[in-house]
């Protein structure tokens, strides 16, 4: 098995990434994302990326081989949802201390932790995550995992993604490699069908995928594995028998999609379930790929019939909100695939995009966005808080959609704000999701509180002309 260093170097040569193919060797070695700053890696390191990409696997115990802070900083930082098992919500850590490091007890402590988890919880598998401290002291988690798997008779998967090796995006890809090396293809299903698909890079934020799965069920399309959102270990172990795949977030798991194509001939495409048009196009592409892979040709006609029905229902429900939102200006401060997928959904509602962030977006994402926006100046990289505040306080936008980190900028500018990132509480995917998005924006913009907070405070208002305050009133 190749070393961690060799794997990391391989990620800088990704044939399925157009941006990567366009670079020369020197530029390619630099990678796409800036590495985390020393001392400020919490929430943006490779370990965090791997944890985010794998933790939604619900019936697996996720064991962090590290000091306590690594698990404390990474637990529950993404609002995924589960339809059954809740084991993934439990934190497990070996709590490596200075004494363990000095005395060399950390590997023994890891083995003991795996045994205790197996006895107390009987998980479908245990995922063991390497971190900076345990990787630097040379703990061989692969050997410990092999021994534990033999001893206890359950899958124990090493995830070698210590934080210092790179960015969060690299950690996503290392998580995909762990699935390829130790999980996918380890179980042969006895119920494989010609209409099985995989959904890659879908995290089921706030239960979003539950609004899409019923559409696929109506078409007779079965989701063999949704990686990682609301998935089970067995689903992923049998994912190699799917006939097609949809990539939702290519920056995270593009290596997984490409290697599943190479090993098991599973074709894939990149799509989005945000907005009416993109949801319909995703359903069409799923049907088209499955028919090419052997599904019945009537799947395409049934898909078109479903699209007509669902689109008509969605547009009818949007009629309530479109007159109230027509022409309203939105500042979209997100990144990645959402830079174009959410922007397209907002434009369908009738909103005007005055600016959108393209941080973490690929060249393909940027090209899609350029086709939607007539003015490239609306696209920006990492926007500073001062620039965001200026855009809002000057009334260049009526609402800002972003993550929780920038919500206080909007509140300081006394402007509406809506959470569009992973911490959100509402589902915006599929036909129902775009209606919910319109409803939440309408509620935010037309909330009467904004008119009240923009009024001057009583003590800021000058006395009316001709009125003089008495000495007693002044003292009061």
UniProtKB/Swiss-Prot annotation:
Pfam families: Oxidored_nitro. Pathway: Cofactor biosynthesis; Fe-Mo cofactor biosynthesis. Keywords: Nitrogen fixation, Plasmid. The keyword Transport does not apply. One of its GO terms (biological process) is protein-containing complex assembly. This protein may play a role in the biosynthesis of the prosthetic group of nitrogenase (FeMo cofactor). This is Nitrogenase iron-molybdenum cofactor biosynthesis protein NifE. It comes from Rhizobium meliloti (strain 1021) (Ensifer meliloti).
